[in-house]
């Protein structure tokens, strides 16, 4: 939602409130000892909204990242190192979206890093677009298995659509934000975002 709010000047207040909420989460995790596995995982995915100062070393973003990842690994160690029952079992749609969105977030961080070479930036951009498409595909294909739509899933879909750089994405995201997160409205716009993203991707490849 913070990513989508940045597209509109009128949503600056929302972006500010989300930033303050992330700072509240940081204090809750580091000082109030709120360290459940779910809270830590959500905090890691939301670290991108901790906007740094003009000089990245002036704020505590790096400390938040290091402390959060360290505590999250300790809490999730028994889950991460679990023995797989079968290699043929597919991930649940929500879990697959979380994993793919994490990869997308890392690629987007590289795109925002100025010293990246042009060829590397182009390769990372294509990989980010592929991950964004996978997030949208998983949301559409897993419609039957998703009994409800968590807010963070909607945030991931909006983030994926923004990364896709589709010309019509601003209007689609604006329409998506107006819904009350019902399954019917969400998946209808997921299909629209996916079709528009794939069309833009195929058009850019043909122009080459």
Curated annotation (Swiss-Prot):
It comes from the Eukaryota. The keyword Nucleus applies. It is found in: Nucleus. Keywords: Nucleus, Transcription, Transcription regulation. Trichothecenes are sesquiterpenoid toxins that act by inhibiting protein biosynthesis. Transcriptional regulator that may regulate the expression of the satratoxin biosynthesis SC1 cluster, one of the 3 clusters involved in the biosynthesis of satratoxins, trichothecene mycotoxins that are associated with human food poisonings. This is Satratoxin biosynthesis SC1 cluster transcription factor SAT9. It comes from Stachybotrys chartarum (strain CBS 109288 / IBT 7711) (Toxic black mold). The lineage of its organism: Eukaryota, Fungi, Dikarya, Ascomycota, Pezizomycotina.
